[in-house]
């Protein structure tokens, strides 16, 4: 190409390369900005650890997962739009076939139109009756963030409802007063988070300040600098723009609830000021919207739906996978393949109460439980820390002694026999004959007034000969005035002469004494009467015979005194004081021995010196036996140290705090308990399930289904498989036993529900789910209707008189029967929406279309229930409207009356239920027309608990969730609508009585993943609050 300027290009090569480089840089900059603008950053998140393991998130000490958007909140340039919650179980993940990956977040990018009249207030959403103190606990709420309990507004960012167990979501726009760098700070009790967007879009909100993550952090009102996380970095804001913000707050049941947001210009010395109405505005006006309208509710990285619960080891055993949860999806065997496998037999158990009169509400006593194999892990083992009723032990006994009685400690060399150990550790039992009778007790009451000392001395004071056992004059010695005053307020106790110590432990070696006195005087003394140290040294305190074999220090006692003690002689009374023990006064005796010194003297007890005057009447107190002992005298710290034993180291439960010895005082004689780290023990295998029976235990609400022994289940399955292969020539092989349920009848036999996974030769896996009856030898029952008489017993039992399986007549369940869920509702918008969403998910993930939803609406004002039913993707639904107050019995009866097919199942349901994926299959299996009704046990979730972290108890007393055929429901008379009207509670028990009297069995089982949501009861009974609020309630 002669026209191409090759020489010029060669000369300007460097300029051309620079131009090319600048062009590439400009193009890359344009591409980067175009991708970053909608929130898709090019850089890769550092989501992998050192060893290549993926980091799923951060979990705090309480198990609350910290959202990934808050882990790097300081990086304001990072977009949070594509951040997703960790993989796990979402609301639909309990259903088989659900999505394995979380759906993308539907964050709000477009804001609704804003008007000038929005200024001066912001939106406030309240989530009531939800426990926990962390914002993560609020995000666990089933209705967060779209369906709050209350929608209202607030005029400044400082809220204190003076309530407990709630969560707040405050959102709107902030209007800065001037351009510049602004710092924000949040303070609250308990945790809170403040999110701020760089513009008016909720999708761009970033966490800028927060108080705690675990729920234990809090601040005082206006304390903006307690935590470093409270204060944000400076943010460049412009007065001409508005910025979306969001404030999340969680309050538990303690403390002074408050949450406030302050701001200040980024200048030295300025303090934070509350953001008031002049600088805030509404996000949107919700006053005219019903509670089921949620399209306007903003979803931001702080508050959005679609996040899954945190991953981790399940806290409950019931959350682990079980074949029962998905076995209903396996194709069922054709009924023709099971005909004539077992011979038919009549089924009429002896526990049927047909036409048997029972008292009101006594049907609970005639409901029996079924045995399950294999273990379905419905026992709430994670709740047994607080409730140990499963072990059939007294809670007080377990708290005091634990489970040591099930352990046999191994003996060591030189250790005494176990029986001697028991005797050595026995408690002191006093002889009742040695205590005072009623007359003596009356004398004791009279002794509170000054009486003649000689009378009391003649009754209660032993002679020296009696107390010492030596030959002396029978005349009592003269006593000092101090002894007379002491004896006036004395009480004699005749101790039983037992050599056992009072406290547990090794008994100290006996001491050589001449003879123990038969009575001990416990006296009250006046303050100011104290013996000299010399008298104490010369007269040591003798131990009580048979009670204490060595001295024990008396703990300091705090006595209860009147709040306003009387004043005497102008002296000022002082408050209660803890006084020290006063040593005993040496009495005048005619004996010089140690034992003779006990006569005529009393035990000094600690008193409270209310006045400084001696004339003031003393405040006295009777002490327990463990406190009646000699105080440790000075200089006796090391005396008798070698005589001690572990049993002497036990102290009173009231004296938990030990006094530190003063300088120069010798340490006490008490030694630390010895710990034997090498102690071993023997124990046998304990099966506490053997202690349970099929009686409906109404006292223990954490125990699971009864466990069927494996040998019994395997034996029944082996008999059935033998008969099945005998008919089909070995065409089926057993893969596994999925479920076996047994209802016991000790007189005629047991009913079994067998659910087996079989493999057909050359075919696919199939599901066998049939009722069989294990008839006892010699048991013969005629059919109720006279149809299909039972063959004689000789032809139906084995020669060795073994029980044999047979097919119970009229006890076959239908797989394609229609199930009608009947739910009465009123002003429960958020729960109606959740119920319809759960039913839609049940239809989508199971593919089962044989169910119908019947909602009976009592003039709900917070939503259009009929419109919500039409919008839901349900196979069938019916909307029934009633007027007046809410009546559960009338609502249920109205729903049943709307069912036309008598051979369909009606399930009397509640609105706040979380259903397991196999709920339809469970209802059909346990409802047989004319024979069986089904009352599954639901687990009531506690406050702040969710289906993915269930904490609660089984509702063993409730029968409100009830499945029964329409024909049987009509035959028993339906609901009692006359007696149970405005209130509910008891209508389920009354229905149960009539169902049992009609001759039906009621199957009672605890279902896995079957929960009753914890919900607020405020507003459910149309109650009025003392002070109305401008709010919409759901």
Swiss-Prot record:
GO cellular component: Golgi cisterna membrane
Chain spans, region Disordered: 51-104, 450-486, 556-600, 626-669, 782-801
PROSITE patterns the record matches: PA14
A molecular-function term among this protein's GO annotations: N-acetyl-beta-glucosaminyl-derivative 4-beta-N-acetylgalactosaminyltransferase activity
Glycosylation sites: 106, 611
Biased composition (Low complexity): 461-473
Residues exposed to the Cytoplasmic side: 1-12
Chain ranges on the Lumenal side, renumbered to this chain: 32-1034
Name this protein carries in UniProt: N-acetyl-beta-glucosaminyl-glycoprotein 4-beta-N-acetylgalactosaminyltransferase 1
């Amino acid at each position: 190409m002669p026209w191409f300027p090759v020489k010029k290009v060669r000369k300007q090569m460097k300029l051309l390369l620079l131009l090319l480089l600048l062009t590439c840089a400009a193009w890359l900059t344009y591409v980067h900005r175009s991708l970053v603008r909608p929130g898709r950053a090019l850089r890769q998140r550092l989501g992998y650890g050192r060893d290549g393991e993926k980091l799923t998130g951060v979990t705090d000490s309480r198990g609350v997962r910290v959202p990934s958007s808050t882990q790097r909140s300081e990086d304001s340039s990072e977009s949070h739009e594509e951040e997703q919650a960790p993989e796990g179980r979402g609301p639909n993940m309990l259903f088989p076939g659900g999505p394995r990956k979380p759906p993308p977040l539907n964050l709000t990018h477009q804001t609704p139109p804003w008007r000038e009249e929005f200024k001066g207030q912001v939106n406030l959403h309240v989530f009531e009756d939800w426990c926990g103190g962390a914002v993560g606990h609020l995000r666990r709420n089933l209705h967060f963030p779209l369906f709050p309990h209350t929608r209202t507004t607030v005029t400044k960012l400082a809220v204190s409802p003076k309530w407990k167990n709630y969560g707040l979501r405050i959102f709107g726009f902030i209007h800065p007063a001037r351009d510049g760098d602004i710092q924000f700070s949040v303070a609250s009790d308990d945790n809170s988070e403040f999110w701020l967007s760089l513009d008016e879009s909720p999708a761009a909100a970033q966490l800028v300040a927060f108080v705690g993550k675990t729920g234990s952090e809090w601040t005082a009102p206006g304390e903006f600098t307690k935590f470093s996380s409270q204060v944000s970095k400076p943010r460049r804001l412009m007065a001409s723009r508005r910025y979306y913000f969001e404030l999340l707050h969680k309050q538990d049941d303690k403390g002074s609830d408050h949450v406030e947001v302050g701001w200040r210009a980024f200048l030295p010395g300025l303090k934070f000021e509350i953001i008031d109405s002049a600088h805030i505005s509404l996000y949107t006006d919700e006053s005219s919207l019903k509670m089921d309208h949620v399209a306007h509710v903003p979803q931001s990285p702080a508050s959005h739906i679609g996040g899954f619960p945190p991953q981790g080891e399940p806290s409950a055993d019931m959350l682990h996978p079980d074949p029962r949860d998905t076995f209903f999806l396996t194709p069922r065997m054709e009924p023709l393949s099971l005909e004539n496998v077992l011979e038919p037999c009549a089924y009429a158990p002896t526990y049927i109460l047909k036409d048997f009169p029972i008292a009101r509400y006594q049907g609970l006593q005639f409901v029996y439980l079924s045995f399950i194999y294999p273990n379905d892990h419905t026992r709430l083992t994670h709740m047994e820390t607080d409730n140990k009723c499963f072990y059939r032990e007294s809670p007080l006994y377990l708290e005091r002694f634990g489970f040591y009685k099930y352990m046999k400690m191994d003996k060591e060399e030189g250790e005494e026999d176990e029986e001697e150990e028991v005797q050595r550790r026995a408690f002191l039992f006093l002889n009742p004959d040695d205590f005072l009778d009623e007359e003596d007790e009356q004398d004791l009451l009279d002794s509170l007034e000054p009486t003649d000392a000689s009378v009391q001395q003649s009754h209660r004071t032993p002679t020296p000969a009696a107390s010492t056992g030596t030959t002396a004059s029978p005349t009592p010695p003269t006593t000092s005035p101090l002894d007379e005053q002491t004896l006036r307020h004395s009480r004699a106790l005749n101790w039983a002469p037992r050599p056992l110590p009072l406290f547990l432990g090794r008994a100290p070696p006996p001491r050589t004494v001449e003879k123990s006195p038969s009575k001990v005087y416990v006296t009250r003394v006046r303050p100011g009467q104290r013996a000299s140290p010399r008298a104490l040294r010369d007269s040591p305190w003798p131990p009580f015979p048979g009670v204490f074999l060595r001295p024990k220090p008396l703990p300091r006692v705090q006595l209860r005194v009147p709040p306003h003690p009387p004043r005497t002689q102008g002296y000022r009374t002082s408050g209660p004081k803890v006084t020290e023990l006063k040593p005993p006064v040496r009495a005048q005796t005619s004996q010089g021995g140690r034992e003779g010194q006990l006569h005529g003297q009393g035990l000094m007890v600690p008193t409270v010196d209310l006045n400084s005057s001696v004339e003031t009447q003393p405040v006295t107190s009777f002490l327990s036996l463990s406190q009646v002992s000699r105080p440790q005298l000075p200089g006796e710290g090391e005396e008798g140290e070698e005589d001690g034993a572990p049993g002497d180291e036990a102290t009173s439960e009231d004296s938990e705090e030990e006094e530190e010895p003063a300088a120069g005082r010798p340490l006490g004689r008490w030694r630390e308990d010895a710990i034997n780290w090498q102690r071993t023990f023997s124990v046998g295998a304990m099966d506490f399930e053997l202690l349970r029976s099929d009686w409906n235990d109404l006292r223990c609400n954490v125990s699971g289904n009864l466990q069927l022994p494996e040998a019994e289940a395997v034996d029944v399955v082996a008999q059935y498989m033998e008969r099945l292969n005998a008919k089909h020539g070995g065409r089926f092989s057993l893969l596994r036993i999925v479920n076996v349920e047994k209802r016991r009848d000790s007189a005629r036999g047991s009913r079994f529900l067998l659910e087996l996974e079989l493999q057909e030769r050359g075919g696919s896996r199939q599901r066998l789910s049939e009722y069989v009856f294990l008839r006892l030898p010699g048991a013969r029952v005629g059919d109720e209707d006279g149809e299909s008489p039972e063959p004689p017993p000789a032809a139906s039992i084995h020669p060795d008189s073994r029980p044999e399986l047979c097919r119970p007549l009229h006890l076959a369940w239908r797989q394609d029967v229609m199930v009608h869920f009947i739910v009465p509702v009123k002003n429960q918008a958020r729960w109606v929406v959740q119920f319809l969403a759960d039913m839609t998910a049940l239809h989508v993930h199971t593919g089962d279309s044989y169910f119908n939803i019947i909602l009976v609406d009592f003039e709900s004002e917070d939503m259009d229930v009929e419109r919500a039913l039409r919008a839901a993707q349900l196979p069938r639904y019916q909307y029934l409207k009633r007027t007046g107050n809410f009546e559960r019995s009338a609502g249920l009866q109205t729903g049943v009356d709307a069912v036309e097919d008598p051979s369909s199942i009606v399930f009397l349901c509640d609105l706040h239920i979380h259903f397991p994926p196999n709920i339809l299959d469970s209802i059909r299996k346990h409802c047989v027309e004319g024979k069986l009704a089904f009352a599954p046990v639901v687990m009531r979730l506690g406050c702040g608990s969710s289906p993915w972290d269930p904490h609660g108890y089984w509702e063993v007393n409730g029968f409100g969730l009830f499945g029964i055929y329409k024909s049987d429901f009509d035959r028993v008379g339906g609901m009692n609508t006359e007696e149970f009207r405005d209130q509910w509670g008891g209508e389920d028990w009354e229905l149960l009585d009539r169902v049992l009297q009609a001759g039906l069995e009621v199957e009672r089982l605890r279902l896995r993943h079957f929960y009753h949501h914890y919900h607020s009861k405020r507003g459910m009974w149309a109650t009025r609050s003392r002070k109305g609020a401008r709010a919409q309630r759901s």
